[in-house]
A protein has these predicted regions:
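Acidic/glycine-enriched connector segments
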Residues: 8-119
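Extreme N-terminal starter segment of soluble prokaryotic enzymes
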Residues: 1-4
Length: 119
């Protein structure tokens, strides 16, 4: 059993983007795997929740604790990066912000680019 992190830019929130994410998810998912994500209502986080519901897969959501201030999202990203065994990232063209932060933290931990899937 592995944990698949699914994250992504809020700007990539179309049905087409969901289908792209779903195809990659099906490629790496094995029976018993779980999903981890960040609870944003748009983009990759929303796709994670849709996939979990659609397939009856357990999901762990790391919501940001905004009482910690403006860095709460980046702190939350650390938890996702630490928990995931593989990471699907629905990236925006500019490749900045929280999604890129999660990718960087994940790759620093696993040191294996084949576990990071950019879609």
């Amino acid at each position: 059993m592995k944990k698949i992190g699914i994250v992504g830019s809020r700007s990539r929130d179309s049905e087409k983007d969901f289908k792209i994410c779903e195809v990659k998810f099906r490629e790496i998912y094995e029976e018993g795997d779980e999903i981890v994500s960040g609870g944003c209502p748009r983009g990759g986080d929303r796709f994670a929740e849709r996939l979990a519901k659609k397939r009856g897969i357990p999901i762990k959501i790391y919501f940001p604790d905004w009482s910690l201030g403006k860095n709460a999202g980046f702190i939350r990203n650390t938890f996702i990066a630490q928990d995931a065994d593989e990471l699907i990232s629905v990236v925006a063209e500019d490749r900045t912000g929280g999604t890129e932060d999660t990718i960087s933290k994940f790759l620093s931990r696993v040191n294996d680019e084949s576990k990071s899937h950019l879609v």
